[in-house]
Amino acid sequence: MLQRTPLFPLYAEYGAKTIDFGGWELPVQFSSIKEEHEAVRTRAGLFDVSHMGEFEVKGKDSVAFLQKMMTNDVAKLTDGRAQYTLMCYEDGGTVDDLLVYKKADDHYLLVVNAANIEKDFAWLSEHVVGDVELVNISNDIAQLALQGPLAEKVLQQLTTVDLSTMKFFAFADHVDVAGVQTLVSRTGYTGEDGFELYCRAEDAPTLWRAILEAGKEEGVLPCGLGARDTLRFEACLPLYGQELAKDITPIEAGLGFAVKTNKDVDFFGKEILKKQKEEGAPRRLVGIEMIDKGIARHGYAVYVNNEQIGFVTTGTQSPTLKKNIGLALISTAFSSLDTEVEVDVRGKRLKARVVATPFYKRTK
């Protein structure tokens, strides 16, 4: 039986086409991936991301615990701020990438990928020491993401809290949004400005309807996983299971900014990640653009002179750039810009070249 989010009963009303996404029945699209993608890039779109996992960490030893488990420096967080971070195994491979929200000195919220909820909770539980209470609240919490240049304008209609003062990666808890108690976070997974909204599961339908109603005149669309993927891909934001995995380190994936090997705490993977940061990793995630006609898909092999040098992690035709592009994890020796490589597309070797990333960056 597939799991469903609290918004599942509303999907049909909005024309959703659902798919099995890691054991969840979720909308791949409502109108079309291209229309939804364009709405987020030019106006705003609303996503149901209630399948994501939420853990609460409480207790006076919370910081020490999180510092041991996370690659980023959790001690630098102040109340009302969020941080992107990763959890690694001792060999540097990635357990998951996640967000850490600091509510108070002894109270944190972790937001993890849906497919990794059980694995992450087990990994964290195994290493709890001291006064730390770890609770999986995933089933109690719904998450909506309103993303795009008009996100603030639309959301502001529904709350008295001044959203214009909220910086990127800041959040406010207990905010009244359309009569619903909400944690409002200026974060996202699209490369655009936007907000991620956390509320009680039973309140999600009210919040969903209110946001779409408030955004009607601005052309805000409900959006599915298809557009979420093309948007995050253009912005070069990693997807666990593709750009990150148990055998891919954050350094290889180009996420060194979230790995603080200089923090005075030993965390899982620190030794190897420090070495890779200082000496370079054997593989590197790069952007590629197809020269020959064809689309590079996840898992396709990448070659130079008949030698396999890596594989494609994500690839598609970019709706914004109208180009066939991809992300590939390849041997660092071949990662310089403009290096010509070949991608095995269904048995044919097609030419591509290494290009700069991100493919898309919003203009302020």
Swiss-Prot record:
Its EC number is 2.1.2.10. Keywords: Aminotransferase, Transferase. The keyword Transferase applies. One of its GO terms (cellular component) is cytosol. Disulfide bonds: none annotated. SUPFAM superfamilies: Aminomethyltransferase beta-barrel domain, Folate-binding domain. It is an enzyme of class 2 (transferase). The glycine cleavage system is composed of four proteins: P, T, L and H. PANTHER family: AMINOMETHYLTRANSFERASE, AMINOMETHYLTRANSFERASE, MITOCHONDRIAL. This is Aminomethyltransferase. It comes from Anoxybacillus flavithermus (strain DSM 21510 / WK1).
